[in-house]
Amino acid sequence: MTQEKKAEDLERGTDATSAVPRLWSTHCDGEVLLRLSKHGPGHETPMTIPELFQESAERFSAYPALASKNGKKWDTLTFSQYYEMCRKAAKSLIKLGLQRFQCVGILGFNSVEWVVTALGTILAGGLCVGIYATNSAEACQYVIQQANVSILIVENDQQLQKILLIPPDKMETVKAIVQYKLPLMESMANLYSWNDFMELGNDIPNIQLDRVILSQKANQCAVILYTSGTTGTPKGVLLSHDNITWTAGAMSQEMEINRVSGKQNTIVSYLPLSHIAAQLTDIWIPIKIGALTFFAQPDALRGTLVYTLQEVKPTLFMGVPRIWEKMQDTIKENVARSSRLRKKAFAWAKMLGLKVNTKRMLGKRDIPMNYRMAKALVFAKVRTSLGLDNCHAFFSSASPLSQDVSEFFLSLDIPIGEIYGMSECSGPHTVSNKSVYRVLSCGKVLSGCKNMLYNQNKEGVGEVCMWGRHVFMGYLNKEEATLEALDENGWLHSGDIGRLDSHDFLYITGRIKEILITAGGENVSPIPIETLVKEKIPIISHAMLVGDKAKFLCMLLTLKCETDRKSGEPLNKLSVEAKSFCQMLGSQATTVSDILKSRDQVVYTAIQYGIDIVNQQAMSDSHRIRKWIILEKDFSIQGGELGPTSKLKRSVITQKYKAQIDSMYLS
């Protein structure tokens, strides 16, 4: 019986042979049935990661693969050097006692060492486990224990000290720790510097490593990704070799970026590699297409990203909504400081850009003559200021992009393609690109995959369910959770609510776990309301709706502020855009405290006016915001309110600001 027939039988809910591997497994050493299509997309020959890596190392051998900043210059590794360095790391891991299917934890910011460890681990037959650099010691302990981490790779002394806070009896599986950035401040048994670690395996023969590589199968686990825990305890998502290699190939096709032809594609790595979106775009797709990955500075998200972009000028750029929002703020601030003539030119070009690109979106290609002028006078300069002048593909993932941000960049000739998915589907499920694009849509289903809307209502809105070679193996050691995510026919239930239009574009309208159910039994999806509030009130940074089991809805608001460049913490000082908003109203406020202490009348009135506009668009009275409160500090990753990709951690926020929430319902 062929793999295609077995997968087809299981999709129908039947199993023709009892000995067939299941579509799921919760064990590190488990094997699953691959979801091969009968023909076309999804029918490609399965490959292991080592097979893909070796093929690319041979094909792109002399091309630069990785680049990291060393003072004022960039040090690069070719694909050939990259592959050999990963083999060297693999031998050292074997020397340290790494066995098949044992886990190697990586704790630190994106770097050559991070990626080499990940690939070295997989070549050595182990499983790569990324740990978010922002994790607390307790969160690190959870991952180490749950995955039985065998070897731990940490970035620097700061991360090492975090690990040393974990009680030794909770680290019994850890055989060794490697620190990949100097200086090495501690001296202890089984602690190695990166250079010493890389020399450990010199006496391991090539044939020993090759045997391990040849023993690997495409339907076995290669990577474990931990969910960010925005809706509960993090779970270890098991991804197979085929999940990774097939999805990287499918995405390079959908993103319209192929193997090297003429100019090499370049990417800037700055989003945490522990997240599937970054791992796919910064490691796996570049290996597939022969792209060059530049590593940004560790403080990229605290303001230095734009300098790296201006220097590197990537051809592909992936952002999360918060990054695009900050870029929008920067552009607006620059325009606000410009002359009256430049402001007029900017407004004219934006209006023309939105008109032309909206037509393009619908398949119309007629471009007016003055569009070239707008491109030269405005669009090209905006791209250059962002470091995106060589960029031909722009993407956003991790959470929905607002209509305001999407149309703002579309009007500047920067169409941002949304990618929708989750860790459990190896990253993407639907993709938008410049050829397949609609504002507010996250595109069409990845070729070779299937989509189902489960339990649809009369408007055609239902839970998004997925089938394809991108669907994960299961959750590590969590059978019950795995069987909640995968139904009896193998469909992955996303927990997201969406609808399809007549052209098969997917629109996500909410998330089941985030829906608020009022005391009157009304279901309210918070994201559309929160997004509208941020669009209507320019001073608002974050908005979070509350009111589960309550008589009415309330909202927590934070204001746009400056950020501490070193710590990433939001400051009390208002951002340039926020100050401009206040000045336009006649307020002299320059800090959040100024607004809160005096309960600045004009600012509060303006916010209420924006809330009133949002309420006018409410579906019913139960969807209206009755009360709101401004918090003293903006949300941040460091403060615990945001996840690694800047998603709201609703349960954390609800608990942290319980007193403020209670005050709205008691007053």
Swiss-Prot record:
ATP binds at residues 227-235, 418-423, 496, 511, 624. InterPro entries: AMP-binding_CS (IPR020845), AMP-dep_synth/lig_dom (IPR000873), ANL_N_sf (IPR042099). It is found in: Cytoplasm; Membrane. Keywords: ATP-binding, Cytoplasm, Developmental protein, Differentiation, Fatty acid metabolism, Ligase, Lipid metabolism, Membrane, Nucleotide-binding, Spermatogenesis. It catalyses: a long-chain fatty acid + ATP + CoA = a long-chain fatty acyl-CoA + AMP + diphosphate; (5Z,8Z,11Z,14Z)-eicosatetraenoate + ATP + CoA = (5Z,8Z,11Z,14Z)-eicosatetraenoyl-CoA + AMP + diphosphate; hexadecanoate + ATP + CoA = hexadecanoyl-CoA + AMP + diphosphate; (9Z)-octadecenoate + ATP + CoA = (9Z)-octadecenoyl-CoA + AMP + diphosphate. GO terms for molecular function: arachidonate-CoA ligase activity; ATP binding; fatty acyl-CoA hydrolase activity; long-chain fatty acid-CoA ligase activity. One of its GO terms (cellular component) is cytoplasm. One of its GO terms (biological process) is cell differentiation. It is a peripheral membrane protein. Gene3D superfamilies: N-terminal domain of ligase-like. Pfam families: AMP-binding, AMP-binding_C_3. Its EC number is 6.2.1.3, 6.2.1.15. Its main location: cytoplasm. Testis- and brainstem-specific. Expressed in pubertal and adult testis. Enriched in germ cells and Sertoli cells while present at a lower level in Leydig cells. Present in testicular Sertoli cells and large motoneurons in the medulla oblongata and cervical spinal cord (at protein level). It comes from the Eukaryota. Belongs to the ATP-dependent AMP-binding enzyme family. Bubblegum subfamily. Catalyzes the conversion of fatty acids such as long chain and very long-chain fatty acids to their active form acyl-CoAs for both synthesis of cellular lipids, and degradation via beta-oxidation. Can activate diverse saturated, monosaturated and polyunsaturated fatty acids. Has increased ability to activate oleic and linoleic acid. May play a role in spermatogenesis. This is Long-chain-fatty-acid--CoA ligase ACSBG2. The lineage of its organism: Eukaryota, Metazoa, Chordata, Craniata, Vertebrata.
